[in-house]
């Protein structure tokens, strides 16, 4: 996978303004409209993003490509750099659902050496802030993600009042199940969900998640995932009511 990372950007460039960073050694850029990335910066940045994915996953081919680009106007981006280059990123979308505002976490990756520093939680807070979710008086925000990573599932479920599918109990929420189907149909036309477990078959045919030792809630989630989606190409599509 070296050819994906050889052109990694070492910074985003002076044409972009960094936001306030909680870490002295990270420069962070938050772009609600990913199409603001200039054409000349797109390939190096995409190579860097694919390079991180190739570290965290067994990847047969690049995940982000010119035909499946993270720089479409429909996406928003958060990028984290240190002195060596891009170390983490998050791609997300803001959706108008029939039940109101929707947020979808399209993909978040952090290099192993930078995991455990709170970047995932920072990304989540920034996504909620930029989406306008924090200003909603009713607090009714649908928050969706697709994964087979137990840590990611547990981290996202933690910020939700309820989640479908509910991996840790047998609770069923018809409204959330309907939201899962609506969001999935909007994002991935032609990719059906298997109800009630919200399984998306073949979601990760080109990449395979690196398994690891899990602790706490993540270990319980891992056990549930191992039962429901033993095939490494399958994923769970989840939607919850975000606490804002």
Residue locations for each model-derived region?
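Conserved acetyl-CoA-binding loop-helix of GNAT-fold acetyltransferases
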Residues: 110, 115-131
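A short linear-motif detector with a strong N-terminal bias
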Residues: 5-9, 56-59, 82-87, 121-125, ...
């Amino acid at each position: 996978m070296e050819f994906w990372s050889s052109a990694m950007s070492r910074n985003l460039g002076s044409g972009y303004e960094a936001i306030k960073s909680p870490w002295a050694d990270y420069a962070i850029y938050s772009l609600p409209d990913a199409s603001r990335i200039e054409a000349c910066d797109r390939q190096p940045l995409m190579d860097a993003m694919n390079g991180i994915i190739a570290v965290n996953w067994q990847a047969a081919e690049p995940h982000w490509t010119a035909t499946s680009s993270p720089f479409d106007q429909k996406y928003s981006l958060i990028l984290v750099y240190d002195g060596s280059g891009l170390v983490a990123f998050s791609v997300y979308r803001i959706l108008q659902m029939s039940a109101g505002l929707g947020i979808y976490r399209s993909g978040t990756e952090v290099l192993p050496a930078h995991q455990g520093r709170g970047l995932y939680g920072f990304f989540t807070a920034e996504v909620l802030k930029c989406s306008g979710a924090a200003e909603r008086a009713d607090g009714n925000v649908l928050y969706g993600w697709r994964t087979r990573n137990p840590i990611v599932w547990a981290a996202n479920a933690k910020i939700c009042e309820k989640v479908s599918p509910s991996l840790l109990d047998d609770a069923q929420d018809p409204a959330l199940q309907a939201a899962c189907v609506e969001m999935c149909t909007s994002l991935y036309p032609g990719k059906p969900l298997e109800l009630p477990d919200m399984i998306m078959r073949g979601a990760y045919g080109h990449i395979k998640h690196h398994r690891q030792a899990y602790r706490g809630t993540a270990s319980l989630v891992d056990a549930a995932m191992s039962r429901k989606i033993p095939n490494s190409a399958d994923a769970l599509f989840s939607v919850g009511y975000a606490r804002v």
